[in-house]
Amino acid sequence: MELTPREKDKLLLFTAALVAERRKARGLKLNYPEAVALISAAVLEWARDGRTVAELMHLGTTVLTRADVMEGIPEMIPDIQVEATFPDGTKLVTVHHPIV
């Protein structure tokens, strides 16, 4: 199976998000890469569902709370940018202050 670099990046992100999801389900606090992966994967899935950029910018802030991540992580992630595929093309989605 031949994958483009972009497809490989998406698979890596999705795998990291699965690990983060499982750790969160076990009650572990997420670290920086896990938090970014989980939020990014959620945004990509919602974009695939047909949500708008504005909706994704808001929904991205609802994935995790301070209680879900290690101390200091919310301050390390002022925003997350995700290149998502929409029905009308690819767009850059920026989620400001994703962990409240």
From Swiss-Prot:
Gene3D superfamilies (alphabetical): Urease, gamma-like subunit
GO MF annotations in UniProt: nickel cation binding; urease activity
Keywords associated with the record: Cytoplasm, Hydrolase
Pfam families: Urease_gamma (PF00547)
SUPFAM superfamilies named among the record's database cross-references: Urease, gamma-subunit
Name of the top EC class for this enzyme: hydrolase
BP terms from Gene Ontology: urea catabolic process
Pathway the protein contributes to: Nitrogen metabolism; urea degradation; CO(2) and NH(3) from urea (urease route): step 1/1
Sequence similarity: Belongs to the urease gamma subunit family.
This protein's name: Urease subunit gamma
Taxonomic placement: Bacteria, Pseudomonadati, Pseudomonadota, Betaproteobacteria, Burkholderiales
